[in-house]
Amino acid sequence: MWLEESQMKSKGALHPRRIPWVCAVVSISFLSACFISTCVVTHYFLLWKRGSALKFSDYHTRLTCILEEPQPGATGGTWTCCPVSWRAFQSNCYFALNDNQTWHESERNCSGMSSHLVTINTEAEQDFVTQLLDEQFSYFLGLSYEKVEGQWQWVDKTPFNPNVVFWKVGEPKDSMEEDCVVLVYDQDKWVWNDFPCHFEMGRICKLPGATFDWNPSK
């Protein structure tokens, strides 16, 4: 049953014309809090913000958004949003797990979270990823040796660059059974080592983050 205007006033209800202003105040307060610190939002807030569907599946219903460091002189910046508990770096999201699985089980687990085993394409990315890891564990990468093609390949089909590698000294050994790659902590640094794919290791999953630009002057 709809309330008449007089009833709304007597009951302290909001006049319909005030509702947009209240929504605006709530939105401004929300965004101000986000600008001060990392912001946790829902998938649906970002659908409204961007006006389009995100890359995330319904598996990830809550996201953490961070504002990337703006360029000197810039008036705005870029928000990168990742599922809660994932870490953002250069528009991608990363999640490390220590429980042991085989390489194929690890990739299936990542796929179930709309991601893949991690690809590493730069030294900066290698440095970031290794900050997430526990030195007591080793972690599968999304890199494996395809005997038919006779070369290393990333699981997400990212081109493999032989000039951007971080092999342990003496690796890879090109053993018949060591067709998968793990990150291992050896002599005070994280390095790549080829391992049998049926060994059980931890894993690192990676997926593209959701990004949108923010400009306070607009």
From Swiss-Prot:
CDD domains listed in its UniProt record: CLECT_DC-SIGN_like
GO cellular component: a single term: external side of plasma membrane
InterPro entries: C-type_lectin-like (IPR001304), C-type_lectin-like/link_sf (IPR016186), C-type_lectin/snaclec_domain (IPR050111), CD209-like_CTLD (IPR033989), CTDL_fold (IPR016187)
Residue numbers on the Extracellular membrane side: 48-218
Xref: Gene3D superfamilies: Mannose-Binding Protein A, subunit A
Keywords: Adaptive immunity, Calcium, Cell membrane, Disulfide bond, Glycoprotein, Immunity, Innate immunity, Lectin, Membrane, Metal-binding, Receptor, Signal-anchor, Transmembrane, Transmembrane helix
Main location: membrane
Function: Calcium-dependent lectin that acts as a pattern recognition receptor (PRR) of the innate immune system: recognizes damage-associated molecular patterns (DAMPs) of pathogen-associated molecular patterns (PAMPs) of bacteria and fungi. The PAMPs include alpha-mannans on C.albicans hypheas and mycobacterial trehalose 6,6'-dimycolate (TDM). Interacts with signaling adapter Fc receptor gamma chain/FCER1G, likely via CLEC4E, to form a functional complex in myeloid cells.
Protein name as catalogued: C-type lectin domain family 4 member D
Originating organism: Rattus norvegicus
Record lineage: Eukaryota, Metazoa, Chordata, Craniata, Vertebrata
